[in-house]
Amino acid sequence: PVYEVSKGEKVLFIGDSITQGYGTFETGQTFVNVANRALDYELLNQGIGGYYFDKNSLMPLEKFVPDKVIIAMGTNLCYWDDKEKYIAGFFEKLPSVYGKTPILIITPLWRADYPDAFDKVCEVRALIEKFSLPLKNAKVIHGDLLVPHDEKLYFDKLHPNAAGGKIYGENLVAKIKEIKF
């Protein structure tokens, strides 16, 4: 016999190489997959290495209309002089694509690949908070609180390894439940 599989909410993850899972080298240990085992979403992971807040990439999907969107990126803009322009443009366009869809925005994780890296993460986080504030359908959580600031949890002081991905996913689930997203 064939049984129909029940599917949870449709959730679109938009992000960079961390969302894609680079650094874990174990598909099951990416934070997206760890979280999904507990949340049981029907998900589409659009994590792309090198991705940043590019408004031109925002467009409605025809074959996957999400019930929720989770955006997790920003670290690739840390050292860009014009990062504000990109972050502002992305969040200005976002309502035209996902204006009524609940959105969770995860700011960049802690990183230690350069001496001033975390200061740069905090700059990006402040810009994300500033430009997402007008969005009534969005909630922001600090990514640097989801993975401990411990180099042993990172493959290269930037991308979480399998242990870091597991912790990230578990902490994300707890946060999603806490804020009722």
What annotation goes with each model-predicted range?
Residues 51, 55-181:
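Alpha-helical cap/lid subdomain in secreted, periplasmic
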Residues 1-65:
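Serine-esterase "nucleophile elbow" of acetyl-processing enzymes
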